[in-house]
Structure formats: C-alpha cells, structure tokens
Amino acid sequence: MPLNLQDKKAIVDEVKEIAKGALSAVVADTRGVTVAKMTGLRKAAREAGVYMRVVRNTLMRRVVFSTDFECLQDTFVGPTLIAFSTEHPGAAARLFKEFAKLNKEFEIKAAAFEGTLIPVSDIDRLATLPTYEEAIARLMATLKEASVGKLVRTLAALKAKREAI
C-alpha cells in the first residue's frame, strides 16, 4: 500500500530530527536477513542508543539533504537500513559490524561521521572508537603511569644526590 503525502512528510520529519542530533550514521543492506534476526538487531540497537529505520531511498535522500550525512546519498540503492548513533559515534558501526560477523547476508554499505563518508574498508576505525567511559579510564591509567614514573625518577635522583655527598 503506497504512503500518502502526509505520511511521507511525517517519516521525513521524524528521521530528519533524529539525523540532526546524531553523531554518526551507518547504512546497510538487509537482503536475506530473517525477520527474527532483524528483530534481535533492533532490540540490541535500542539498548545501545542507536536509532534504526528502513526508509524508502527517495525519502532518505530528503532526510539527509542539508545535514552532516548528505555524503551518504549515493549509498541509498536497493533495500536500505540506516542507523543513527545518538549517544556514542561508534555505537551503530560497532553494532552493525558484530551483526555482520554472525550474518553473512548482512552487508554494510558505508558510514558517515562529522560530514565525512567512511567507506566499508574503514568502518573499523569508527567501530573501535572508545566510549566516554573507556576514554576516561585510559586517560586515568596514563596519568597514573606518569605519576609512578615521576616518583621513580624523583627517588632515583634523590639516591644519586645522596651518593654524591
């Protein structure tokens, strides 16, 4: 059943609003993936703070027009699933990458981050971005290592100074 104009406008407005607040987007082809697997993916997406939607390609072109994701327009060919990361830039890429490992039919087409098109070959860079908590933990570990190293150097300097006396 075809959508009427008001329904199309409502879909475009809803998805465009999400796109404006999103940090990154990933586009995939879902041909051959079962409904049960897609339902599992949707559930995982909700838990990860990822907005997923299957939208007609013509409507998706309208959605991404004049947004950071305009570079994705050429990827809207065939059945298209788009996911917007709203909390962490790598969330959708990580989710799709893990799902693609388990489902060979699932094909990631491309991603966009900060207005830049990221080809499939470089999706790993986006997927492996640390979360906020991971980044803070790494920073704290680095600072802790620096403090220990500084203490060791100070003690070595004191020892050398005492030996010189």
Curated annotation (Swiss-Prot):
InterPro entries: Ribosomal_uL10 (IPR001790), Ribosomal_uL10-like_sf (IPR043141), Ribosomal_uL10_bac (IPR022973), Ribosomal_uL10_bac_type (IPR047865), Ribosomal_uL10_CS_bac (IPR002363). Keywords: Ribonucleoprotein, Ribosomal protein, RNA-binding, rRNA-binding. GO terms for molecular function: large ribosomal subunit rRNA binding; structural constituent of ribosome. Forms part of the ribosomal stalk, playing a central role in the interaction of the ribosome with GTP-bound translation factors. Belongs to the universal ribosomal protein uL10 family. HAMAP family: Ribosomal_uL10. NCBIfam families: PRK00099.1-1. This is Large ribosomal subunit protein uL10. It comes from Hamiltonella defensa subsp. Acyrthosiphon pisum (strain 5AT). The lineage of its organism: Bacteria, Pseudomonadati, Pseudomonadota, Gammaproteobacteria, Enterobacterales.
